[in-house]
Amino acid sequence: LHSGRVYNASGSIPTGGVVTSYGNTVSGIYDNILVFGGRAKLTNAYNGITTKWSDESHSFVNTANYISPRSNLTSTGLVDASLGIGGIYNGTILNTTDFYNGTVWSTLTGMSTARESHSSIGNVDSALTVGGRTATDITDKSEIFNGATWSNLSNIPIKIKKATLNGKAYDALLSAGEDASGYQMKSFRQLGDIWYTVGDVNIPRTYHSASGTSTNAKLIGGISNVGS
């Protein structure tokens, strides 16, 4: 039960669009979400009140940077104020930051470190991005976006990709994922610009999802080398 009503996730999922495309990303809240990226170049929106999917065929500003599909990017924000961050296109790992205002996309200042399979949390005015894979290695770099520019923060304690982030910028929880040695169980808490080691997750995993805050988080699914 949410906000006095029962959530009913019905409506047909579009076929052949971004929702079913590998490597896409999602922003928004449970009954109002935006799906974009992946191997399709569409943007799909979902309204949980009307239980309807729609193809958002709005024009893309700066087509050189976002008219093409891209995989393994991340997103933060809401349906009418969302960021698309990094990813990979045609074998090139990107540092791009794209802003969706509910109608059109535009390109903002890029990250210092181009990356894919990274982790992001926050909103369009305070977005934290950590880890991921660069052209040469898995990275431990951490950056913060203030709505206009990116700034480097303290490195996370591990070079990790495909981890999850809970919470918000400067108060985040980084969990599991994959480093050079394999799947990980480690978790780290960010307080301000300092990262602390906290308790391990129950099993090593990657490609998982997460929900909650930095102090009350849930990990969901994923791939593990200990069961499934």
Q: What residue ranges belong to the model's regions?
A:
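Kelch-like beta-propeller repeat domains
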Residues: L1-S228
